[in-house]
Amino acid sequence: EFTARAVRDCWDVGLQLGHAVHSLGGTIALARSEIEFATAAVEARWLWGDRGLAEEFRQSFARRVVAGRMSRFYRDCLEARRVEWARHGLSASALVPDVKRSPGGLRDVQLVRWLGFCRHGTTDIDELVHRGPLLPGERDVLVDGHRLLTGVRVDMHLEAGRAQDVLTRDEQLRLA
């Protein structure tokens, strides 16, 4: 009931939420079969409710979806991005980019986080620097790029009054 009410309230103010309710086992099974769901689950965090259940999910997900099939998870993440790049153009210098999905967009920052989780058990960029796969300068590029792209994306959403990820020529001129 809480979830239904919260989703309804979000819709009433114009927010679009993806949502579903699954058992722990069903969530793990879905994450093992759909990489898009699995990568969303990498970013899952406790907001409200049973903190113990959230921690049980996190541990089960890490063990059964990622660590238990590390090479496959890694390969599937990369393949999903390749498919998205092909769909949205292969150039990071597109004239009308999708700030979320085009090469060099927000998904590429997320990809670093997903692969970091896969190999090092964390999505935290600073922790990935500490553990070694990222250099401090790479961290700065990722953090600054994420901040810029997120700001642009949020601004476009607010201006459009809906989800808007394509940085059209008009949007480029407005934001310049």
Annotated model-derived regions:
Residues 1-176:
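A nucleotide- and high-energy phosphate-metabolite-utilizing enzyme signature
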